[in-house]
Amino acid sequence: MKKFLKVWSVLTIICMTVVVFGGALVTKTGSADGCGNSWPLCNGQLVRLTDVTPEKLIEFMHRMTTGISSIFVIVLAICAWIYMKNRRETKPLAIIAVLFLIIQALMGMAAVVWGQNPYIMALHFGISIICYASIVLLALMIFEVDRKFDARNLVMGTKLRVNIYALTIYTYLAVYTGALVRHEKASMAVPVWPFENGHFIMPTSVQDYVQYFHRLAAFILIVWLLYVTWLVFRDYRRYRVLTFSMVLSLVFIALQAVTGALSVYTGVNLYIALAHSLIITMLFALLCYLCLLASRSKSNRLRIK
């Protein structure tokens, strides 16, 4: 059973990664209306080879991969619930994974049938990364990463725990601003990075405000992440799980900044934009894992005593 769970959890992560990629691809290529206003079929029927368009194919494939991923997520949640029922985090994570998967699908359906609001569609991406993060956490528990990094003895102080919780919430909000940039079609509102012609220009449109707000949010995120990393290396260097996680998070945020800048310089190159979406998804999942470790800190302290 354990071997099956390991294989299945990896396959589920791969499937959810494809879904995240697919959703970003739909947005980047403007394929959201590729299947008309019917759901789950395209214009009320399966795609016929005689009338295939790139937009229709992208949208239909996204729906199909979402359906397949749903099966993987539900099976993983049920099996983890049964096999790891003695772990206190298993049931909440399994419920979150399935619940947010359903919400994500319903929001996608609503957007197709009743039209797309950019602020709601930006939240659609945020829902998907919560589902993704819960699947990653279940997989890490299945692979017993805690034991490999000796995380069972990890004890965090209040300052670090509060910063990790707050940073994770803030990262989610920053992700929302990035998704809003895409859905408000503001990616090239300020075509030079970080500012227009090297100078700050007062925004004159909604797209300008959205773009500037996202860049400000990203800058604060980088500074905050550097601060938390400094805290870890100053006070918790003996815990490999923390030092490794923070180094990895810095790699992610550096790649995120680079792909963000390159997205502007290349006129929103499709592959760079997709990488930009995937990297922040993985960073959010990593921060959620740190939240999981922080939530265990008090019980670890009592157990060690």
Swiss-Prot record:
Residues 28-63, 114-122, 182-212, 262-271 are extracellular. Residues 1-6, 85-92, 144-160, 234-240, 293-305 are cytoplasmic. Disulfide bonds join C35-C42. Pathway: Porphyrin-containing compound metabolism; heme A biosynthesis; heme A from heme O: step 1/1. Its cofactor is heme b. The chain crosses the membrane at residues 7-27, 64-84, 93-113, 123-143, 161-181, 213-233, 241-261, 272-292. Its EC number is 1.17.99.9. The active site is at E59. It is found in: Cell membrane. GO terms for cellular component: plasma membrane. GO terms for molecular function: metal ion binding; oxidoreductase activity, acting on NAD(P)H, heme protein as acceptor. It is an enzyme of class 1 (oxidoreductase). Heme o binds at H62, H124. Keywords: Cell membrane, Disulfide bond, Heme biosynthesis, Iron, Membrane, Metal-binding, Oxidoreductase, Transmembrane, Transmembrane helix. One of its GO terms (biological process) is heme A biosynthetic process. The keyword Cell cycle does not apply. Belongs to the COX15/CtaA family. Type 1 subfamily. Catalyzes the conversion of heme O to heme A by two successive hydroxylations of the methyl group at C8. The first hydroxylation forms heme I, the second hydroxylation results in an unstable dihydroxymethyl group, which spontaneously dehydrates, resulting in the formyl group of heme A. Interacts with CtaB. This is Heme A synthase. It comes from Listeria monocytogenes serovar 1/2a (strain ATCC BAA-679 / EGD-e). The gene is ctaA.
